[in-house]
Amino acid sequence: MSEKMYATLKTAEKIFSEISSVITKQEGLEILNGSIPLTTCLDKAFQERNRYFYNKVRIHILDNIKNGYCPEDCGYCAQRKNANSGIKEYPMKSEAEIYEDAVQAKKNGAYRFCMVTSGTGPNRLTTERLASTIRRITNELGMKVCLSAGLLDEEKAQVLKSAGLDRYNHNLNTSENHYPEICDTHTYAQRTQTLDSVSKAGIGMCSGVIVGMGESFQDIVDMAFELKSFRVISIPVNFFIPVKGHAIKNPGILTPELCVRILCLFRLVNPDSEIRIAAGREGHLRSLSAMALFAANSLFSSGYLNVKGSEIIETVTMIRDAGFVPELVDGGILPEESGTEMLYSEKNFPELYKFKKS
């Protein structure tokens, strides 16, 4: 046996057997490059997932409350300036519209309602509008709310915190090294400053990544450890979708296996964080979507910002088929009747009912 092969097997043995071990950056690279068997990675990742989240999966539902009109130039985004993506632009929805969206999300079994607005960041007036909406949703529906509204200072974060916001999303998206390749209208440092502001206000930090934008394995490993240094409690892992109008020069090739390995990496580096399968799940994970839940404990359903996704019934069925259960905001479990029976309803499969007696 070669010295290199022996070292690789010893690394796999360590990750497999030492439940409380903390992986190094080198071990992270070996997870991504295939040196460690996928089943070994999943076994270790599942042990950590199960330790903190048991067999529960949290479903998040996005509400794109303002689309387009963005002055930023993030290369991955259909809403970026000069994108010519053909998306339907609209100003911020009214409080009543957003509230009704939240009502529907709760009916669908959402653990958290995620409000997303385009733009560099909210001004004072917009912050107050958002705070009013958040206050109503949390008080009247008892829902957990996450807001993604761009760059934020501590003063505005305090306003949102006072309204009941317990989670703010601001993705780092890629490594500091790779950031100039994807955006030139703001800096990586400005994004980390927003995380600092959110933390100082006492709001839980949600920050994640987009993989597949031409970054290296080292960049992905660096991102996982950077988020660990910020003690981020919720990490959405997006898989790049080449939407019309994007400006990513050399998108990477993402196989379903690599996507699962990436989720394992983020779980092993951030064992007690909520790891969420985000945009690109349907197209990149494909038949391994259910397998990915052995590393991740959360996912989005019912679509993304400008891309369709799996509907809630399909998502819930996949979760249950894999032996997991959808977790509700009160810690309970989504009732069984919202699953397979609805999936095979007459509306969805009329051919199954064509001989039904009237």
From Swiss-Prot:
First-level EC class: transferase
GO biological process: biotin biosynthetic process
EC number: 2.8.1.6
Binding site for [2Fe-2S] cluster: C114, C146, C206, R276
PROSITE patterns listed in its UniProt record: RADICAL_SAM (PS51918)
Protein origin, superkingdom: Bacteria
Protein keywords: 2Fe-2S, 4Fe-4S, Biotin biosynthesis, Iron, Iron-sulfur, Metal-binding, S-adenosyl-L-methionine, Transferase
Pathway: Cofactor biosynthesis; biotin biosynthesis; biotin from 7,8-diaminononanoate: step 2/2
Catalytic activity: (4R,5S)-dethiobiotin + (sulfur carrier)-SH + 2 reduced [2Fe-2S]-[ferredoxin] + 2 S-adenosyl-L-methionine = (sulfur carrier)-H + biotin + 2 5'-deoxyadenosine + 2 L-methionine + 2 oxidized [2Fe-2S]-[ferredoxin]
Cofactor(s) named in the record: [4Fe-4S] cluster; [2Fe-2S] cluster
Keyword DNA damage among UniProt keywords: no
Gene3D superfamilies: Aldolase class I
Pfam family, one: Radical_SAM
Cofactor note: Binds 1 [4Fe-4S] cluster. The cluster is coordinated with 3 cysteines and an exchangeable S-adenosyl-L-methionine. Binds 1 [2Fe-2S] cluster. The cluster is coordinated with 3 cysteines and 1 arginine.
Keyword Transferase: yes
Binding site for [4Fe-4S] cluster: C70, C74, C77
Occurrences of domain Radical SAM core (ranges): 55-278
InterPro entries, per the entry: Aldolase_TIM, BATS_dom, Biotin_synth/BioAB, Biotin_synthase, Elp3/MiaA/NifB-like_rSAM, rSAM
GO MF annotation terms: 2 iron, 2 sulfur cluster binding; 4 iron, 4 sulfur cluster binding; biotin synthase activity; iron ion binding
Self-association and partners: Homodimer.
Family: Belongs to the radical SAM superfamily. Biotin synthase family.
Function: Catalyzes the conversion of dethiobiotin (DTB) to biotin by the insertion of a sulfur atom into dethiobiotin via a radical-based mechanism.
The name this protein goes by in its record: Biotin synthase
Native species: Leptospira borgpetersenii serovar Hardjo-bovis (strain JB197)
Gene name as annotated: bioB
